[in-house]
Every structure is written in structure tokens, then in C-alpha cells.
Amino acid sequence: MASPSGQYIFGEFSDDEFKQFFVTARCTVELPPYNEHFFPCGPQSSGDFQDDMHLKFSEVIHGISGEDCPRIEFGIEEVIDHSTALPNNTDYSISSNLNPQAPEFILTCSSSPKTSNNVLHENNFDAINCQFSECAIPDGSGNADSDGTSGTGQRERKKKKKRPPGYYSYLEGVGDVPSETLVNGHANSTGLNSISTDDPDLAEDIPISTTSPRTCNSPDNFVDLNNEALSNDASMHNALDNARTAGQPEECSVTSSEQSCIPSDNGRESPVRTAVVQPFAGTDTTENLGVTNGQTLESSEEGTASNGVVLLPEVSSLSEEAKPEETSTAQAVVHLPGSASANPPAKSWASLFHNSKPSSTTQVAYVETKNATPVTSPQVTEKQVEIKEGPVPVSEDPVAIKIAELLEEVKLVHKPVSLQPRGLINKGNWCYINATLQALVACPPMYHLMKSIPVYTKAQRPCTSTPMIDSFVRLMNEFTNMPILPKAKQASGEKVIRDIRPGAPFEPAYIYRLLTVFKSSLSEKGRQEDAEEYLGFILNGLHEEMLSLKKLLLPQNDKIHINNGPDPVSEKEEINKDEQEGSDEEWEQVGPRHKSSVTRQADFVQTPITDIFGGHMRSVVYQQSSKESATLQPFFTLQLDIQSEKIRTVQDALESLVARESVQGYTTKTKQEVEICRRVTLEELPPVLVLHLKRFVFEKTGGCQKLIKNIEYPVDLEISKDLLSPGVKSKIFKGQRTYRLFAVVYHHGNSATGGHYTTDVFQIGLNGWLRIDDQTVKVINQYQVVKQTVERTAYLLYYRRVDLL
């Protein structure tokens, strides 16, 4: 850096430089008209400086116009008094038609570490007109002088005089380390470039640039790319003498020019006094360490900035290691007041020459960018948690092992629970879901199972491997217990109605979202769906999630095949398989009268869901002169065919289920047609038996049609021994095959592709029945449950074993 006795910005132009800047048609300088106002310049002790500057300036002007010009001296050490100065008057301004985008436009980008004292004393600069707008000077009374001596600062504040705006705009960009000189509006890519910082960690983290040493010494000030000039007297002098490439071609995009040459409103400070381009609202300026010295501009792009701005990428670790004093400085930078202060700044002319030599120990680097696009802080990006759609694997869920251990030791509770009824809001065609949910809530073992699983918040469990379990745990916790009424009140229906106070209805949107999470065919909103299909979706989904949790508790060499039953095959394919040689899943079983049969069982692992709803059926194939072939298949619902005219009751449908049927057209390996028969029996009865009355059938002429016929169903259902497999008839007692109705899901309407679903549930606290139609809840009598109409027909029947009541 040059000393005070050195040469200044307007001295010693070379011939090429003089012609380039002051002779070409685009580089004329318009002087203001002569005025009687006289501005004393600088400290009184610096008379030589004033004379030299005036002489050199006069020589320059004389070379341009060929005429002698009046002596106009400018001072830079006094705060401009907005009440007396005329910053916007053209009589006191110097304008130029220098094109900022032309090769002749040279800027020196200098920077140095700044304290809050120096940061607060900047002016708003219009890079297009080369003028300063009115600056907002904060209160600097509490700041020390830049040279460290309070006496000197006090004396210099008294000597400051007015200056026309814009003349010393090139003195605003400063720094104490070698920095990039922007020639032709951009940085050279072959020399070292610097933007200094007080934090030594920054120098270690930022890569070193290899650009050419087009740098200059600069006084102690900072660079505001929106509002400040980018040079000073010594830095411009060095740039002109040592690093001038005025003839170098340059392209400056309109976008870049708009960003770097935005004039500030007169009399008002820029909202954010940083190098961050103001339109980028998404940029976090307070967390960027570069904001503390007003030097950096965030960017994620590479290359040369189209507006010639040297960009420093934000280092995420830098913000975390920022010093407290730097943080406070950043706050001072951002929250500048909008009004000017009457107190003079603590800045002096002599301070421009202090600490001006480059630092040999500080490592600096820069990143050039062509497109100054808005970017977010890398620090925020690193902290963002990756959000995955759908469930995560159980291995990535830290809570999964806890739930697995809980489910492994859980014991089902069948004790009835009295819950305060709540309706479910239906904003779409979700009635088939709402009806199914009300039936499951009324199922005591299902309710107790879900209540035994703890509820985890998003903070405790940001990702889950069991979204379906989580949703039903949340659903059951929506309902609270209701005290059981005395028997005296139960005798009067009027009193019961007055005592039943349903809770506020709610929308189980988290249940609806499960259809999307699992990409089910049921996920299309507004589509009329089937309640039995949805029940199967729920029970199978819960079962599979529990199987995944169960794997965590088994050795790695033990594998569980998630399979609720064998793949569906036709009757002929199944019979052909029976003739093949036996496998590990087959065994020979001796039945009554010493008849033997080969039995196959599908892979099946028990879970709490199968312990509640799971049963087994035995399908036996009889063939003359061959052993019986049997297959055990699990089920969650019993599918009852009611199409036959003979079927009028549920008992009729159950007997039809186990009736022996003949299979026509079956041939053996020798292609001989033989007569075979098939029969299905109940091998194992579940605690909760769900009967599906198959009302929707396909006809060859009319497609899918609804069977509108009344099927009688009792409140207490006894499973006949004739329905049981021969091997279990003597093992299942009457109490284990007697069931009581606790929920009925109805389908309303005559169409198979439309209609509505409602549910009747038994309320133990009421000792009666409730009819729930979405968010409507009302009390009904038992005879209304079993009585069907043409418009409302039973579709799903939920029974509980009486020995578990």
C-alpha cells in the first residue's frame, strides 16, 4: 500500500491509458459548471496532498478539454450535512458516460477485515451514474477512531468538510490483503485473488485460487457490491500501473448489471449491507460469516461472474465456528437504521493508509461465477433430514425392535371396553373405510392390542417401518373410556339416550393416507370401494408389518416367509399338484376309520392379528383309488356364497360352504377322465369370526350385479360340528364354537358400483346398539340390527366367541 507521501490515483497515466480513458468517444468526462462554493480538502497538515491532487486533476482535465478549468477541491473528512449539502444537485456532481460494461471501466475489488465501526460508515453508490446517493450514517459516537487514537479522531472529525457526492467513490473499496482487481468488469483467472477474513479457519477451509496477481493494496474498508464503489486512491494507482488490461474484451449480462448496479434510495440505507444480491430473498445472510465483514456473496456456480463480482462460497463449518464478536458484527450489519446520524463518523483520512500492507500469512481464495443465482446455505442442506416416501426398512427404524419385543410378549385381552362413541367425518367417498373402522374399534381384542403399543411423536420417531400399526394405534387413542351405566338406567331407553353423549367427530385422514403410502388399488379418492376388500387390506397389512418386526428377534439364519396363504390356483392345478410327489410341507394323516390322507400346509407364521382374526380351512380332494389330498389354508374372513335360491340364512350359507362338490373334466396323467370331489371344512376357528355375504356377483349378460335378498343372521351363532374337520370335531367344545354378534356393516343401494356403507356396533356401556353413519351416532334397538330392508342389506357380520366374553 502506498504511504501518504506516495503517488495518488490521478497521477502518472501512461499514454495508452490516457488515450483509452480520456480520448475515446465513450470516455469523455463532463465537469460541473463553475461555482463559488469552495470545499477545503483534507487535513490541514496535508497541503502537499491537496496541491498534488489538484495539479494532477487539472492536467487530466486540461488534456481532455484543452482549457483551463477552475480549481475545485474536495474534502472527504466531514460528514455531509443533509440539511445544507445538495447531493442531488447536478452543480455538485461529476457524471461520466463511461460505460460500465465497456473495457475501459476498471474496478478494484479490495477488501479487508472489518469491524462494526467501519462497516457502519458506507455510502450508497450508483455504479451506473458514478454518483453517491444520500447515505445513512449510523451513530458513530461510541466507536473508536480507526487509527486507534481518540485524540486524532476527535481532531479529524472537526476538520471534515463537505464533498460533492460521487467524486471519491473509488475510495470506498478497501482491504488489507491482496485482493482481486476487477478489470473490464471481471476477475482474471490466472492470479491470486483474495477476500480476507478474521477467522483463520476460513483460510484453511477455502481452496486457494490460482488467478493472476491482478491485485492492489487497499485501505481499511469493506466492499458493498450493491451500494459501494470498489476502489481507493492507492489501489486504483496500482491497478493502473501494474495490472491494466483495458483492452481486454468483456461481456456483462443485463442481469448482472442489474444486480451489481442497483442504486439505493436517497436518504435510506440498504436493508442488508452485504455483498449478497438483494433480490435473493431466500439467501440466509445472517448465518454467512462473510456478512461480518461485508465481503462475500453466496454462490454454488463456477466460472467468472458476468457482473465481474468475485464470489466466495459459504462454508457450512464456518458458520458453526463463527466467533461471538463476528456474530454480533453480522447483526450490526443487517440491522442498520434507516435514518442518518448527526454524529460524525470515527473514520479519518489518515485511517485509509493504516494497515494497508498485504498479509503474508493469511490464505485467501475466491470462487468466480457466471450466474449469480439464489442459493441456500450448505449448512442448512446438511441438516436437512432426507424424507423418504413410504415405510423404511425395519433395520433403519430404531424403535422397531422395541415394538417387536412388545408384540412378542403381548397377551390378547378380550374383556369388553366401554368407549365414548365418535363419528367419523367423510369428505370423500370414504364411507366404506369409516364403516370398517367403527367395527374394528368395537372389537375389544383389537382395541386392547393397539392400546398396548406406545404412541411415538415425530421427534421420537422421524421415520417409521410400521405406518399401518402407527395409524391404528393413533386411531384407538382417539377414543376414551365411558363409564358403564347402572342396570336401573339401562332399563329405560329414554334415560339411556340422554346419558349417551358422543364425542366430537373427527376425520381420520392419517388412515386414508395409508392407501397412498402402500399404493393400493383403493387409493383413488372418490372411487366407490368395497368394505370387505378394505378390511382385507388392513388385516393383511398389519399382519405383514408384524412379521417384519418378528424377524428382528430371530437369528439371521432363520427366515420368515411373509405369506398369508398359498398363491391362488385353479381347482384343476391344485388337484394336479396333489398327484405329484410329496414335499417337506406334506405329511400323511390318518383320519377316522383309519383312512389316510396327504396334507399340505401353506407357510404361515402367527402374529397378534392372526391370533384375533385368523382361522384355518381344510380343503380335501377325494379321488377313487387314491389317497385323500388335503390343504390347510388360512383366512381372515369366511366368504359365504348366497346366490343360490336355497340360501336364506347364514347357517344355510355355512352349510353350503362345506358341502361336497364335484369337479368335472378332470383327467389323470394317463389322460383318463375320472370323477373327483372336493370339500371344505373348518379346521380352526378364530376368536373373532368375520362372515362376508357375497352380494356382488358377475353375470355374463349384465356384468357385476348386487344380490338384493334378505339373509337372516342371528345375534348368537353356533357353528355346527358338521362344519368342522373330522380331526377337530371332538376337540372343540360348544362354547368354543358359539359366537355373538357385535358389529354389522351394511350396504345401502341397489347398485354394485355405488351406494353407501353404515355400521351398527354393540356398546357394552350402553348394553345396546349404536347406529353410526359417518359422523352421525344414534341409539337403536336390537331388532333394528337384525331387521333388513331392500335399501339396507347386511354385508359383513362380526362375531366374537362367547367363551372369551
Swiss-Prot record:
Catalytic EC class: hydrolase
Example of a GO biological process term: cellular response to interleukin-1
Keyword vocabulary terms for this entry: Autophagy, Cytoplasm, DNA damage, DNA repair, Hydrolase, Nucleus, Protease, Thiol protease, Ubl conjugation pathway
Primary localization: cytoplasm
Superkingdom of origin organism: Eukaryota
Entry GO CC: cytoplasm; early endosome; nucleus
UniProt region (Disordered), positions on chain: 139-170, 561-593
Keyword Cytoplasm: yes
Active-site residue list: 431, 756
Catalysed reaction, written as an equation: Thiol-dependent hydrolysis of ester, thioester, amide, peptide and isopeptide bonds formed by the C-terminal Gly of ubiquitin (a 76-residue protein attached to proteins as an intracellular targeting signal)
Gene Ontology molecular function: any one: cysteine-type deubiquitinase activity
Pfam families listed in its UniProt record: UCH
EC number(s) reported in the record: 3.4.19.12
Compositional bias of kind Basic and acidic residues: 569-580
Disulphide bond pairs: none
Domain USP: 422-802
Localization annotation: Cytoplasm; Nucleus
PROSITE patterns: USP_1 (PS00972), USP_2 (PS00973), USP_3 (PS50235)
Compositionally biased region (Polar residues): 143-153
The family this protein is said to belong to: Belongs to the peptidase C19 family. USP10 subfamily.
Function: Hydrolase that can remove conjugated ubiquitin from target proteins such as p53/tp53, rps2/us5, rps3/us3, rps10/eS10, becn1, snx3 and cftr. Acts as an essential regulator of p53/tp53 stability: in unstressed cells, specifically deubiquitinates p53/tp53 in the cytoplasm, leading to counteracts MDM2 action and stabilize p53/tp53. Following DNA damage, translocates to the nucleus and deubiquitinates p53/tp53, leading to regulate the p53/TP53-dependent DNA damage response. Component of a regulatory loop that controls autophagy and p53/tp53 levels.
The protein's name: Ubiquitin carboxyl-terminal hydrolase 10
